[in-house]
Curated annotation (Swiss-Prot):
Species in which this protein is naturally found: Pectobacterium carotovorum subsp. carotovorum (strain PC1)
GO MF annotations, alphabetized: sulfur carrier activity; sulfurtransferase activity
Compartments it resides in: Cytoplasm
Similarity-based family: Belongs to the FdhD family.
Entry protein name: Sulfur carrier protein FdhD
Entries under HAMAP family matching the protein: FdhD
Cellular component, GO annotation: cytoplasm
Length: 277
């Protein structure tokens, strides 16, 4: 029986792990002898607002209530969790449907936004209907947060603990909220980096984490900067690089963006005044 290790605990190959499934694989030294291995699950998830399907995303089938909340906030569909009256996660044809009940005011705003897009030619950029939606205006963030880079090292070491699926599949991204003292308050993982961030933003809103910063295991794209800024996150740390558009958006909305985060190293792209050694 093959054994895997998650958070120091041995995990048998026949153990259930939410968001992962088993599959027989072959290795060069045993091409005729299959062995069990773990694969991260990836399923289509439809977000349905008041009975109207809004978007379908590929995601890990876990923490979907947090995903729905975080996506709704980061896309400006709602202003606060109170704008959502209920969330139901239901199996659907070849995937999962997340039914979200919006307040009448927010649903009216969503319908108006969708009507404004009708008849426009899609540009094919991440499902956005027109190029003007890329880098859409975000209110400039205040400068209320500070963070010591020396406290980030503990969070970087502990980030892998968030990736229970990733530890046995090597196939997920992580997003965590880091308190000013370097403690990981919580985190999420997903096969999609944007979905992992949305799940974290949902958890942050639910838990009302205010002080601290977001840390992601991936690169920082413009979408991740924009989503963070929409939710009032002032500092975003990324393990990998940032794109040029991400830096442009971060500069414009006053977000402190830091890439290549490693113990003892970081590249600060924008607004370093929030940071100290």
């Amino acid at each position: 029986m093959q054994v895997f290790q998650v958070e120091g605990v041995h995990l048998r190959a026949d153990t259930a792990l939410e968001g992962a499934t088993q599959h027989s694989v072959y290795h060069p030294d045993s091409l005729h002898q299959p062995q069990p291995d773990w694969l991260a699950e990836e399923v289509p998830v439809a977000l349905v607002y008041n009975g109207i399907s809004h978007v379908v995303m590929m995601a890990s089938p876990k923490e979907l209530e947090l995903f729905a909340l975080g996506f709704s906030l980061s896309e400006g569909i709602i202003q606060s969790p109170a704008d959502i009256y209920g969330i139901d996660v239901l199996p659907a044809c070849n995937g999962i449907e997340v039914q979200i009940e919006l307040s009448s005011r927010r649903f009216a705003g969503l319908k108006e936004r969708r009507r404004a897009m009708d008849g426009r030619t899609g540009c094919g950029v991440c499902g956005v209907e027109q190029l003007a939606e890329i880098g859409k205006p975000v209110s400039p963030l205040p400068f209320t947060q500070t963070f010591s880079l020396s406290k980030l090292e503990n969070a970087l070491v502990r980030l892998r603990d968030v990736q229970k699926i990733g530890q046995v599949t090597g196939c997920t991204h992580a997003a965590s909220w880091v308190a000013p003292d370097g403690t990981l308050c919580g985190g999420s993982e997903d096969v999609g980096r944007h979905v992992a961030l949305d799940k974290l933003l949902g958890a942050r809103a639910k838990q009302e984490w205010q002080q601290g910063a977001a840390l992601v295991s991936s690169r920082a794209s413009y979408e991740m900067v924009q989503k963070s800024a929409m939710c009032g996150v002032e500092i975003l740390f990324a393990v990998s690089a940032a794109t040029s558009l991400a830096v442009e958006v971060a500069q414009r909305c006053n977000l402190t963006l830091v890439g290549f985060c490693r113990p003892g190293h970081a590249t600060i792209y924008t607004h370093p005044q929030r940071l100290s050694e």
